[in-house]
Amino acid sequence: MERMKLTTETAIDIDFKNGEIAGVLYKGKQLNDGSAPMFSVKLRKKTGESRIVSAKECTFVAFENNIAFYTSECFDLKLLVKEKDGALVWKADIKNKTQDLLEWVELMSFTVTGKLQDEPQGQGSIIYPYNEGCRVTNMAYRESMPFRYIEPDYPSKNTFSIFPNMISAQFIAYLLDGVGIYLGMHDSERTTKHVDFCYYDDKIKVFMRAFCDVDYGEDYSMPFDSVFKVFEGDWYQAADIYYHWFSANKPQGLQKIVENVNIPKWYSQSPLVVVYPLRGKHDTDTTPNGLYPYKNALPLLEDIAQKTEGNVMALLMHWEGTAPWAPPYVWPPFGGEEEFSSFVDEAHSKEILVGLYCSGMGWTNRSQVLKEYPDGDDFERLEINEIVCENSNGEVKSTICLAQRDGFDLCPAMERTKRILQTELNKLCASNIDYVQALDQNHGGCSYFCYSDKHGHTPAPGKWQQIETNKLLSGIQTNGVLLGCESAAAEPFLKQLQFSDNRFELNYYIGTPIPLYAYLFHEYVNNFMGNQICAMLEKRENNFTYRLAYSFAAGDMLTVVMNGDGDFQYAWCDYTPPNDKLVNKKSALEFIKTLNTWRRFGGKEFLHYGKMIAPIGVKCSQERFLLEDGKTYFVADAVVCAAYEFADRKAQFIVNYNFYPVEIELEKVCDVYFDSALSHCEKSKKTFTVAPLSVIMVEF
């Protein structure tokens, strides 16, 4: 057993012989519980078969000069474990003894008690950078839901816990009683990673895996630091560790919004995004809904703009001239270019922006929405099989959007893929619109798994995915049109995907959404609230206003989903009963007006340009929302809070999303602003009332 002393208060006990982290100690208190192999390696054959070899299956040789030596029948491994700046830095060098491919290496794995804090006899929580950020407090609940733990493999699922897809940053943390364990892979090349947690016997294992970027039979040498650190605080302090590294290792060319002269003017005007289908009522429906012809929506959009006293963006679904959600060919638009162009021109004359959903790196063999599309077999004729993502054994299969289409995922390493997608997206960007959600269904912006040995990339997931995707995006002639993806853009794509369709609401299936993404990246990119698909909070009057408040506080632009009557749905593809219940449109518009007025005026420097910081404490009552399973409650404070820093000023926004006043108490005295013009200020306040559906700002 080796005791690695990190600080005067922190020590890590590592049992190198048994290959496990035995103890994580802070001020004498043990933070972990039990143990798991502290490293594992996955090897893959060309047939697609694989095996995982863990530290438990390796023979320990020696630990000398901060390097542990292991051997096995498949590989020899040198593991650097060294104290640096109050943390343990880990690196693995692997000598491959086989002709198999080293697919990934898992490092620094540790276990905690098998129940989290919201379970009987549970403790602790997991900070998880999934879909803009999540605090997980009930492991059994997570495992009972659609976003449970899944071992990633081919073919990709769009729920995989993969960076840079649903996972936006390269770390994860465990919190217990104000102390945390941070795992981070500080990789400036941003290779593909699996960042996750799962049951391990009767415990929970927290781990990170890096894909190795090597070919069959090749060795692997980790080119970055894997960091294990104990810290005091909450999720903000875990994020601070990562933010410190990120700030010194940003993606090339990434600029803060305040410095970025290439962002269009409308970005700073915070338009309300109005999502609606040109036809149909949900993903797989195309029946007339009253919103076609295109211009039918203009009076509804004008009314929304007038009542919110701000800009709006019409973000269209089901506009494709081929079939809804049937990539890659979508142009010309439904009804023809002339009619669409006339709509865009008239919308712009009324200061209404126009955006389009587009379906990313996919190929449609047969639409399930319009079964007559396509009318030929282009897959065979064009030899598309040569450019689709495939398994090691040549199998081709896709699990993405099967209700909408039968098809495949395209591999961005192939020049034909780039050429097809660039050609199609160029047509959209030349149509005088303002925004394209270019990579809907490619969550976070990245491609899906491909193991082909014929595409010119290493025959497994790896850094080539983000490199080739960025090349694809760079080749689009945007003409000033902003691009985005589904879920917030992951770290490698921040420069090119600057306005994306957030998916924080998916985290209700896992735990509690937290604005982790905004805390890390808000200075560089503002997104929008998103179409809220699968937002499964019970339909109470403060359901939608809560989600508006959450997005506002996270620094994002707001969204409504409009139906053919001009009413607002709780979410796109809304299936939460009662299905016919709609948002109170009048109160929603009034609240949006209040929020956007703050965002465009008194709070603009913070909410548009600022760096999110840890907020000061606020005491208030709580609200409870019943979740989809009919027995679990999501508990939220009666006000939503977020704090920002800009130009040496710090401000916190406190939002009451309820239809009743809320009494609050600040942890310290502050100056309080009650209006977005900053004309009504009360000095040195600590307790006060926040009016229904209102915002206050405190400076501290």
Residue ranges and their predicted role:
Residues 294, 339, 345, 353-428, ...:
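Active-site-adjacent "subsite" loops/lids of carbohydrate-active enzymes
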Residues 4-313, 346, 350-353, 435, ...:
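Carbohydrate-recognition beta-sandwich/jelly-roll modules
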Residues 320-321, 358-364, 442-443, 487-491:
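Active-site-proximal loop/turn and secondary-structure-junction residues that shape catalytic pockets
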Residues 274, 312-316, 354-357, 436-438, ...:
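Hydrophobic faces of well-ordered beta-strands that scaffold small-molecule active sites
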Residues 409-495:
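Active-site neighborhood of glycoside hydrolase catalytic domains
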Residues 272-295, 323-338, 401-420, 452-466, ...:
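The substrate-binding groove and active-site-proximal loops of carbohydrate-active enzymes
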Residues 209, 219-224, 425, 462-681, ...:
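Active-site-proximal substrate-binding groove within the catalytic cores of carbohydrate-active enzymes
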Residues 289-305, 417-429, 544:
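Short, acidic/polar
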